C-alpha cells in the first residue's frame, strides 16, 4: 500500500514538472518582478522568472522599463524570452514560443 502511494506521488510530480508552466506560476512570477519596479521611477526592470518561467518571463520584462511618465524600452525577460515595451510607451510584452504577452 505504501509503495502505491509513493508511486502515485512520483507520477504527479513527474507530470507537474513536465508542464511548460504551472497554473498561475509563470504569470504571477513575471508580473510581480517587472511590474513592481517599472511603475515607480522608471529604473526598475527585473526579470520575471517565477516558478513556471514561460509566460511570466515575457510579461515581467514588459513592465520593467519606463516609469509613469517615461516610456522607453522595457527590461528584458528571463533568458530565452524577449524584451517588453515600457509602461506608457512601448506597448508589447516579450515573446515566448510565438505567443506575445500583453504590455502596459
Swiss-Prot record:
Coiled coil: none annotated. It comes from the Eukaryota. The keyword Repeat applies. Residues 27-98 are annotated as: 18 X 4 AA approximate tandem repeats of H-G-G-G. Residues 1-20 form the signal peptide. GO terms for cellular component: extracellular region. Residues 23-97 have a biased composition (Gly residues). Residues 22-104 are annotated as: Disordered. It is found in: Secreted. The keyword Secreted applies. Keywords: Antibiotic, Antimicrobial, Fungicide, Immunity, Innate immunity, Repeat, Secreted, Signal. One of its GO terms (biological process) is killing of cells of another organism. Sequence repeats lie at residues 27-30, 31-34, 35-38, 39-42, 43-46, 47-50, 51-54, 55-58, 59-62, 63-66, 67-70, 71-74, 75-78, 79-82, 83-86, 87-90, 91-94, 96-98. Has antifungal activity against C.albicans. To T.molitor tenecin 3. This is Holotricin-3. It comes from Holotrichia diomphalia. The lineage of its organism: Eukaryota, Metazoa, Ecdysozoa, Arthropoda, Hexapoda.
Amino acid at each position: 500500500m505504501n509503495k502505491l502511494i509513493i508511486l502515485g506521488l512520483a507520477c504527479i510530480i513527474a507530470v507537474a514538472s513536465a508542464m511548460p508552466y504551472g497554473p498561475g506560476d509563470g504569470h504571477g512570477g513575471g508580473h510581480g518582478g517587472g511590474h513592481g519596479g517599472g511603475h515607480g521611477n522608471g529604473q526598475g526592470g527585473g526579470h520575471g522568472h517565477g516558478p513556471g518561467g514561460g509566460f511570466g518571463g515575457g510579461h515581467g520584462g514588459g513592465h520593467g522599463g519606463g516609469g509613469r511618465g517615461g516610456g522607453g524600452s522595457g527590461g528584458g525577460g528571463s533568458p530565452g524570452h524577449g524584451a517588453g515595451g515600457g509602461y506608457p510607451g512601448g506597448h508589447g510584452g516579450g515573446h515566448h514560443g510565438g505567443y506575445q504577452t500583453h504590455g502596459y
